[in-house]
A protein has these predicted regions:
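N-terminal capping/small domains of soluble enzymes
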Residues: 1-105, 112
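Non-globular sequence segments
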Residues: 92, 103-131
Length: 131
């Protein structure tokens, strides 16, 4: 193996990774669909089973105003936390670790009502709504 350290455990002090392989954050689009968290749990568990030591989830908004769309995933209630626990448990069952990426979409976030002052009327390419 050309990278002998890659598959060795890594002690982070607060947790031990089974190896140094990291799956970077990507939005899989399952957070917002029916049974999405169960499907996401299976998706990430398969990666953990395939020797990924640490998985970073796609971005989850920390509040209502930080979501990219009205239906965008957020983590603000105990019920929403329970959905994420399904994913965490599935990854841990396969010996992997998972980190939730907290992501406020900032100027690209969806805002149903724009108050003054507001940005220009020009639409930003990543964000469909126009203020």
């Amino acid at each position: 193996m050309p990278y002998p350290e890659l598959m060795k455990p890594l002690d982070l002090g607060f947790t031990m990774l089974k190896n140094r392989a990291l799956m970077g954050s990507m939005h899989v689009g399952l957070e917002e669909v029916e049974n999405g968290f169960e499907r996401m749990a299976a998706f990430y568990a398969e990666r953990a089973r395939g020797e990924v030591g640490l998985i970073v989830t796609g971005g989850i908004s920390p509040n209502e105003r930080g979501r990219p769309m009205p239906w965008g995933a957020k983590l603000t209630t105990e019920e929403e936390a329970d959905h994420h626990r399904i994913v965490t448990a599935a990854v841990h069952a396969e010996g992997g670790k998972i980190a939730l990426q907290i992501l406020h979409f900032g100027r690209y976030a969806y805002h149903p009502t724009w108050s003054r002052p507001r940005p220009s009327r020009r639409r930003s390419p990543p964000s469909p709504p126009t203020p």
